[in-house]
Amino acid sequence: INIFYHTAGNGSKEYVLECTRHYDTANMYAQGGWYGILANWAFGYGFIAGPESSSHFRFNATSGYSYFNPTKSLYEAYVAEEGVDGYRVSSWIRTFEQVVGMNIGINSTANRYGNEGYFRLKWLASLDDENVSYWCGNQSCTPVIRYADVLLMMAECCIQTNDPDADIYLNKVRTRAQLPSKSNVTMDDLKLERRLELAMEAVRFQDLIRWGDAPIVLADKGKKLPNFLIVPKEGNDLTTAKGIYNAQYDTSVSYTENERELAGWTPNRDELLPYPENEIEVNPNIVQNPGY
């Protein structure tokens, strides 16, 4: 599973449908590289390259904006189901302590807004994924549908129709994740498995809408904005490279209230996204979705 979202995974037998990419100097932004940069860690100002980490990740002033962070809730769900050393969580998420252990220095003066101390490893571009001739070129294909998604969709259908084969399909995913099998699986089992297996793959929102869970799960989403704070401990030597890479830190998370109207969940509006205004102007037959 470590090859997913990397060039090594291009054409994988687990990619049922994928968005392919190729080197095209005339369309670097359009082919998706820009979005990889937006979702990259804040390399360049938040993190500092070490002697080993620089051979795996791209560090420069414009290589990452640190969008798209895993939440504390997601990390804790992984740990509760498979432990801190679970196959999936250790492949797809890093804690701050683990980031420090990756031979990456920390710029403690940089704020990490929108972060609770957990960092996405899934879909994090490596040097092998980058087209080195241009800073945002990315040649790793994006899986639109993975085989695990298909198995879990089949399991969900079986649960809804009281078909005992639901166990078979769900356990195929759990077996690959190095977890014990379950029997007589329920919708709660299915919901958890989809959350963990397909985390950060842009299917969670649609799942919550389909299940009718969005008004509860997303009721307070975005109302409090996290800021991950890092303070070097006394005695650190931050004047040398060795000192930076071996520094120790105290960490905390603060939250600020977000009073924007769009924060949280508004019934009969948030189930759908708005049509872009220019699309409505071009086509008067389009009626804007409710609430916008």
Residue ranges and their predicted role:
Residues I1-A8, K72-A77:
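Short alpha-helical segments and helix-capping/turn motifs at coil-helix boundaries
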Residues I3-A49, S53, G137, K182-Y292:
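Long, intrinsically disordered, low-complexity segments
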Residues E14, N69-R146, G291-Y292:
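Flexible, polar/acidic helix-loop-strand segments at domain edges
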Residues L17, G83-S91, C141-V173, M187-A199, ...:
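Extended, hydrophobic/aromatic-rich amphipathic alpha-helical segments that build helical scaffolds
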Residues Y45, P51-S55, P164-N171:
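Short, compositionally biased low-complexity segments
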Residues G46, E52, H56, S66-N69, ...:
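Noncatalytic, helix-rich "gating/capping" subdomain that lines the substrate-entry/channel surface
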Residues T62-G64:
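Glycine/tryptophan-enriched, flexible segments
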